[in-house]
Amino acid sequence: MKKLSMREMLQAGVHFGHQTRYWNPKMKPFIFGIRNKIHIINLDKTIVMFSNALVELKKIALAKGKILFVGTKRATRESIKSTALICGQFFVNYRWLGGMLTNWKTVRQSIKRLKDLENQSQDGTFDKLTKKEVLILNRELISLENSLGGIKNMGGLPDALFTAGAEQEHIAIKEANSLGIPVFSIVDTNSDPDGIDFIIPGNDDAIRAINLYLNIVSNVICSDELNKETH
């Protein structure tokens, strides 16, 4: 596994936390200091904790486990989606629907509806409907695709949850906790680290930082080396 680079993290701004007035005191152990009223994250700790998280993620991937990537901030949507798709994993990148994990039976019914609509749009069924009916069904299809498209082939609950930010994705984290699903998360200085099994202290706002985390994760869980190990 490639060694994490302090230089790359500095260049991506991983060390920049939030303004000190917005901090969560529970993040104190991961803070190096203050610069211009902004908390600076201790990257030595980030490297150690990220490395530990990567070891566990690799184990899950080697065991053919399902990893659900969650990032619903506008800036992270495309990166979350592309990382999951490249690695043959799953994602939620628009809105986390309450009960997405804890009420999987209902979600499964919605996924069935999504797949039915996809089939109808391709098998000529829509051609037999009025323009108004097609418009209504297309709207439903787009809405379901945005919400569930990234998990429609997951086939059950994931084996791990990876979130690109703890504050934004707190509902997903809480649901995973209640089901005993291990949680891996980027945690900024304004966030509550409770309930996160593998804390990765770091900037969760800068797109360069998010892309760096995701590139590192994808290199570990869907590398050629990993594929060789699983065959």
Swiss-Prot record:
The record ties this protein, via CDD domains, to: RPS2
Which molecular-function annotation in GO is an example for this chain? structural constituent of ribosome
- Any idea which UniProt keywords this protein has? Ribonucleoprotein, Ribosomal protein
Its BP terms in the Gene Ontology are:
translation
- PROSITE patterns, A to Z: RIBOSOMAL_S2_1
Q: Which InterPro entries does this entry report, sorted A to Z?
A: Ribosomal_uS2 (IPR001865), Ribosomal_uS2_bac/mit/plastid (IPR005706), Ribosomal_uS2_CS (IPR018130), Ribosomal_uS2_flav_dom_sf (IPR023591)
Gene3D superfamilies membership: Glucose-6-phosphate isomerase like protein, domain 1 (3.40.50.10490), Helix hairpin bin (1.10.287.610)
Cleavable signal peptide: none
- Name the family the entry cites: Belongs to the universal ribosomal protein uS2 family.
Question: Which NCBIfam families does the record match to this protein?
Answer: rpsB_bact
Name of this protein: Small ribosomal subunit protein uS2
